[in-house]
């Protein structure tokens, strides 16, 4: 049993790495995010905001990992190559954080992309409603944590005076027509979210 658990974890790590790389480099498939037309000079971000954001990232990543392990163990949806192809067929969107890369870090654009991306993944998690009665509490908590993180980012943008006058509208979400699609879509959406959050975590460290 220990060997099977270790193999399952290795497959899960491979899935997250592959999908993270796909999310980072598939710019053409990324959902359009809010752009900021006029970028004022960057102001130092409060340490309290950075610490709170990093803690929220850690909490979401931990819940996401638990949910991925449960989906992998229960439904055997653990083969990266199959899931990536399924993601294309289901139209699972991914958010880009091009403005948050260490090579081209732009504070205002990064915050805007962070907020838009979190709203996207919040919508995806909502679309997964009914994935499994046993997983519903964890999924609901994950969705709430993502929404709270998005609020934290938006409030900081308002404090800096760089928030758009109107919050971005949510993109159309994929329509899952079967329990299998919803569960497979859950694995993909949460894996994309994990990669997104890892980029966000690195960016927040740079902004600090």
Swiss-Prot record:
Disulfide bond residue pairs: 72-78, 100-110
Entry keyword Acyltransferase: no
Alphabetized InterPro entries for the sequence: 4_helix_cytokine-like_core, GCSF/MGF, IL-6/GCSF/MGF, IL6/GCSF/MGF_CS
Compartments reported by the entry: Secreted
Principal place of residence: secreted
CC annotations in GO: endocytic vesicle lumen; extracellular region; extracellular space
GO biological process, one term: immune response
GO molecular function: cytokine activity; enzyme binding; granulocyte colony-stimulating factor receptor binding; growth factor activity
Subunit: Monomer.
Physiological role: Granulocyte/macrophage colony-stimulating factors are cytokines that act in hematopoiesis by controlling the production, differentiation, and function of 2 related white cell populations of the blood, the granulocytes and the monocytes-macrophages. This CSF induces granulocytes.
PANTHER family: GRANULOCYTE COLONY-STIMULATING FACTOR
Annotated family: Belongs to the IL-6 superfamily.
Name used for this protein in its record: Granulocyte colony-stimulating factor
Name of the encoding gene: Csf3
């Amino acid at each position: 049993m220990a060997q099977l658990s270790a193999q399952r974890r290795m497959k899960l790590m491979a899935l997250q790495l592959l999908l993270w790389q796909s999310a980072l480099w598939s710019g053409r498939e990324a959902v359009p995010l809010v752009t900021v037309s006029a970028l004022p000079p960057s102001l130092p971000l409060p340490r309290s905001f950075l610490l709170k954001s990093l803690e929220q990232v850690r909490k979401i990543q931990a819940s996401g990992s638990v949910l991925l392990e449960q989906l992998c163990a229960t439904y055997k949806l653990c083969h990266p190559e199959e899931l990536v192809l399924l993601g294309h067929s289901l139209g699972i969107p991914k958010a880009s954080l091009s403005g948050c890369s260490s090579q081209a870090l732009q504070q205002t654009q990064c915050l805007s992309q962070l907020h838009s991306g979190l709203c996207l993944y919040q919508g995806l998690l909502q679309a997964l409603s009914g994935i499994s009665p046993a997983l519903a509490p964890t999924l609901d908590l994950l969705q709430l944590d993502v929404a709270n993180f998005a609020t934290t980012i938006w409030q900081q943008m308002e404090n800096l005076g760089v928030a758009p006058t109107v919050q971005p509208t949510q993109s159309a979400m994929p329509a899952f027509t079967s329990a299998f699609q919803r569960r497979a879509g859950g694995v993909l959406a949460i894996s994309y979210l994990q990669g997104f959050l890892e980029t966000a975590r690195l960016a927040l460290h740079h902004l600090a």
